[in-house]
Amino acid sequence: MLNNKLTIHKTKKLYGLVSGNIEDTSIRTKEFIASEFYGYKRKFQIGIQSSYKDNESSNKQLLSTVKSLSLKQSDNAIKRNKIGGSKRSEVHSNRSKNYSSKKFRSQKCRRSRQKKRQNKKPNNSRFISSNKTKRKYYKLDFNKFDINGNPEHYLVLQ
């Protein structure tokens, strides 16, 4: 049903997107979220596969419903380092536009870092945050759906 390119991120109950009674004990439901990158956009597919538990009614498999939505990442979210990448790499990419000489760039970077951290105690939170940004899986905020069932919020780095 899904392309091989799509990667499954997380399973979660999606009561709002399913028609019929999900909590019926005779129906087993399987939910998944799959996503694929399109440059600055990440396309999500939310699928719900439902089938009956007992073998007698296994022929009556319910059709799986797939809702596909494309979420555009906001510029502010990228700037604030909420979505993907690390602040460091972002700074370096900006700096490479401004300075042509690599040597000059690295020296300037080193100098500015030494100046900043001279009188400061080492901050452990810096390492924790850098580890967080290395994790590259995302989740949707499921509580924020508008009337049409479209998510109002952008992706949240988990």
From Swiss-Prot:
It comes from the Viruses. Residues 100-120 have a biased composition (Basic residues). Residues 77-132 are annotated as: Disordered. This is Uncharacterized protein L200.
